[in-house]
Structures are given as structure tokens and as C-alpha cells.
Amino acid sequence: MLYRPKIYTNYNIINGGTKSRLSSACYPIQCAVVNSSNAIIDRRSANFEPSIWSFDYIQSLTSQYKGEPYTSRVKKLERDVKKILVEMENSLAQLELIDTLQRLGISYRFENEINSILNKKYVNINNPNYNLYAIALEFRLLRQHGYAVPQEIFNQLKNEIENIKKNINGNDIMGILALYEASFYEKKCESILKEARIFTTECLKNYTIMISEQKKLMIDNDYDYDIEVVNHALELPLHRRTTRTEAKWFIDAYAKKQDMNPMLLELAKLDFNIVQSTHHEDLKHIFRWWRHTKLGEKLNFARDRLMECFLWNIGIRFESKFSYFRTKTAKLFELVTFIDDIYDVYGTLDELELFTKAVERWDVKMINELPEYMKMPYLVLHNTINDMVFEVLRDQEISINIQYLKKTWVDMCKSFLQEAKWYYSGYTPTLEEYIENGWISVGAPVILVHAYFFHANNNRTITNTKEIFECLEYGYYPAIIRHSAIILRFTNDLATSSEELKRGDAPTSIQCYMQEKIVSEEEAREHIKFLINEAWKEMNNDVGLYPISLTEDATNFAKMGFFIYQHGDGHSSQDNQSKQKISSLIIEPIPLYT
């Protein structure tokens, strides 16, 4: 399925919307002088803080885990684990090992073996000896890897599930948790999985209450590890966590598990640290690029969030072999962020019209029509994308049409402009209008279309690029890009809505729905969460319809929305929590021995 972005050209005649009470007079104003006329222009200011991650600090990063003796040790551990995985006779134990490898972030080292095992599981899927835990685990792993497993496989467990409902205890909890995690692979119209999620969520919450009460009464229990993973799952299910972010948490949790395998733990820690050392080199590269542009130095009204932009990248593609991918897409993230701030907080409507026109023309001569402060961002955008096209043609040896890439920037700038028009006119769009514009303005189409062409040197088959993206010539995008973008748009809104209103941005989905339906903020937030679940169902349907690289990028991008915005605006904010996230994933290695 394909989707065309709707760009509203006359915001005064849109039906169904209302005027908001937003006023720029309520927000910080910054005065600027326009050289051509010496006129003073009142500009908004978001008062973004400078980046806390200095160039010198990034260039000084070092890691002891590069090279020997750690790489030799990892190769030995990898051989040993591979032997265990392949030679396992117990089918359930094999599934559990695959799940553990995934959560530890090292399954990519055993990709061929895991695919072979799961293919055999799929062929012999109806195992009469499996209980709820085994069937739910197998179902989740198979769906995760793109197998079309029917939800009806759970019908054989009706009696077992009913018994659990009547009398839940600690022995059942791993089965309930497995079913809970599996239920998030629900597609449209899958009522069995929908009911399973409701039932298991209630059971898991009751279980946490029961354990909490036992601890208050000082009753001994053996569920420390179980309760930790249950609480973690209730906070956010596995299907909404990226491999790298989950690995950082799970390595610590797995170390506390009574029956943990020391060999797996050592491999996971070493792998995490070795991969992290490649991230340091990626960071040094993109920080040198950013310093060379001097955008952050000369135009300090916009966010300088290169480290935060890089964080998105390791959620999408963390493995060492994707260094090329990360260094390219990190630049895209920063350019999207920077240009967003030009539209959101600094440019006048007339200036934004000029910038949008310049992007449409994609011609360096257009800088002569732009105000001084827009010339550098425009040239950096133009030159960076053109250089990327050249480098892909040179390094990747695949065909790339720059018109596809240009189209994404034009659409995004038009959507930014639309939001600016809504703001300056005091117009609050309907939720539908907001969504049709917002899934473009969130920047996901720009990132995902460009990113597709950065995979060819990673043994990823990049074929049928024209078949996949020629729809852009007609104004449409692949459905999986839209669904990923909608999830990202809503997770962003849930975290940043209040802050964006304070600095005078256009209304978010929450305010649009509140005003359209005359409901409270709490009700609006619940509705947005419902729409996120609906978009996930659609994206689950998309699996298998597109190349695996595009599917994985889009899915991981949506997952990173939860990670970045789970506790606030992790993209813009530089509070202690955001700093800790970055430090633990990118800067600090995991101690091998504790």
C-alpha cells in the first residue's frame, strides 16, 4: 500500500478546523536585523542550550576493547556458543537460547544458524508437547522473523489459559509473560491476540502486586529475576524495544539470574564493548563533519544535538559493520533537526516560503534569494546530500536517483511550512489534518528513504530500488514508512507537547484532538496511545511486503521513538536522565567482572 502526503496550500479554507488561542506574544522574542532593509524582525527563541558534548571530548574517546586479545576471545566464545546452539536436542531449550541471544544483543553473530532453526520450527509448528510458554515463545520468535504464523495456534491452549485465569501463581508467570510479549505482534483484526494482551496485562499487574505484598510481609520468595523481567515488560514490551537498548538492560538482569550461562554473559559483555569502540570512531567522524560546517557555531538559535542524533542511529543499526550507515544517517538526523528549528522558532513566514522554494529548485543559485542566515544551512543541505549520492554511487555500486532523495526534503519542508502557517494564523487543525501533515514533518520519510541506499556494502541485497521508490515520483510513500512515521510522531507528541506549546510551536496531536472533540488532556493522550497501537498493527502487517533492510530500519526507527521519548524529550533535553542514557550506551563500557 502507498500513501501520498497531503500538503495544505490554503490554511484559511480548511474545513473542520478551529482557531487556537496561541499567541506569539506569550513566548520569548528575539530581535534580529535584516541586512537588506535594516528592519528589525521579532523572532521567537526556544532558548536551546549548547551541546554538553564537546568536540575535544569526543575526539579523546578511547577503548581498550579494540583489537587483540578481545577479538580472539570473542571468536572462541562464538564458536563454542554456535556449537551448543546447533547441537541442542531439546527443542524448547533451543528456542530459549535464541531468545536469550537476541536479548543479549549477540544474535546477529548466529544469524544463519538461527534462521535455519526457525525455518525447521515453522515447518513442524504444531508440537503437541508444547505448553503455553513454549507455544507463545515460538510464536513470537517466528513472527519476529517474518513467518506467517496464524493466531489460531493458541486455540489449543484454551483450557490451560482458563485454568490460569482462575488461579494464577508463580509457576505460571513465565507462560503468561511469553503470551503477553507475543500479543504485541497482533495484526489488524486478530481478536485472539487482542484478548490475550488484555488478559495477560491484567495477570502480570496482579502478579507484581502479589509479590510486592509478599515482600512487605517479609515472606521469602524466589521470584526476584521473574519480577524484574515482568516489570520491565509492563513498562514496555520487547516488540517496542530495540536490540541495543534492550541488551544494555538485559546483560545486567541476566547476570543476576540463577541459571545464567557465564559463557553467554562474557560474550555479550565483550561484544557490547567491542561494538561500542566502533561507535566512538563513528562519532569522531561526524563531529569533525559538523565542526567543518560551522552551523552550530554560527547559527546558535537551533539545536546542536549531534550526540542525540547519533543515539537514534545505534538504535536503528548498532552492529560494527553498519558504520557507513551510521555516519551517513547521523548527518541526516542533525540536518532535519536544524532545519526544523528554522521553521519552528526562527524564520518568518516569508523567509520560510523562500527556503521551501529553494529546496524545491535544488539549485545553489537559489542562495542569492535567501536571507543571510539561511544561506549556510541551505548550502550544507545541498552539498551533503549531493555528496552522499556521489559516495553511494562510488562505494555501493548501486543505482540511486537523487530525485527520490530531493522529494523527501521537499515534502518535509512543505510540511514544516504548513505547521508555520497554522501557527501564524492561529489555526488548530483537525486530528486528521494534523496526522496527514505530521507523519511527514517528523522526518522519518527523509531518514528511511536515504538509509535504504546505505546498506549495499553490508551483504544486504539492495534490489528493485526503482520498484520500491518510483512511487515517490507520483507523490506516494511505501506504507511501512508512513506507519513508522506515525508512531514516531505520536511518541514525540506525548513527550514534547507541553514544551512545544511553551515555546510557541503549532499544536500537537494532543491539542488538536482536545479541541476537536472537546475532551480532557488525559482523554486525548489515551486516544493517541490507542492510535499508536493501531499503527503498530498495520506495521506488523507490513512485514514481508518490503525488503528486510527497509522493514528493519522502519521498525527500529519506531521503536527508538519509545526509547527517546519514554521519559520526556530525550532528543532536545540534556537533563541527567538523557545524559545517562547516552553515557551508558555510547560512552561507558560494561565491566567484565563485577
Swiss-Prot record:
It catalyses: (2E)-geranyl diphosphate = (E)-beta-ocimene + diphosphate; (2E)-geranyl diphosphate = (Z)-beta-ocimene + diphosphate. Binds 3 Mg(2+) or Mn(2+) ions per subunit. It comes from the Eukaryota. Expressed in glandular trichomes two to four weeks after flowering onset. Mg(2+) 2 binds at residues 340, 344. One of its GO terms (molecular function) is terpene synthase activity. A motif (DDXXD motif) lies at residues 340-344. SUPFAM superfamilies: Terpenoid cyclases/Protein prenyltransferases, Terpenoid synthases. Its EC number is 4.2.3.106, 4.2.3.228. Pathway: Secondary metabolite biosynthesis; terpenoid biosynthesis. Mg(2+) 1 binds at residues 340, 344. Keywords: Lyase, Magnesium, Metal-binding. (2E)-geranyl diphosphate binds at residues 303, 340, 344, 489, 492. GO terms for biological process: diterpenoid biosynthetic process. The Asp-Asp-Xaa-Xaa-Asp/Glu (DDXXD/E) motif is important for the catalytic activity, presumably through binding to Mg(2+). Involved in monoterpene (C10) olefins biosynthesis, constituants of cannabinoids and terpenoids-rich resins. Catalyzes mainly the conversion of (2E)-geranyl diphosphate to (E)-beta-ocimene, and also produces minor products such as (Z)-beta-ocimene. Belongs to the terpene synthase family. Tpsb subfamily. This is (E)-beta-ocimene synthase TPS6FN. The lineage of its organism: Eukaryota, Viridiplantae, Streptophyta, Embryophyta, Tracheophyta. The gene is TPS6FN.
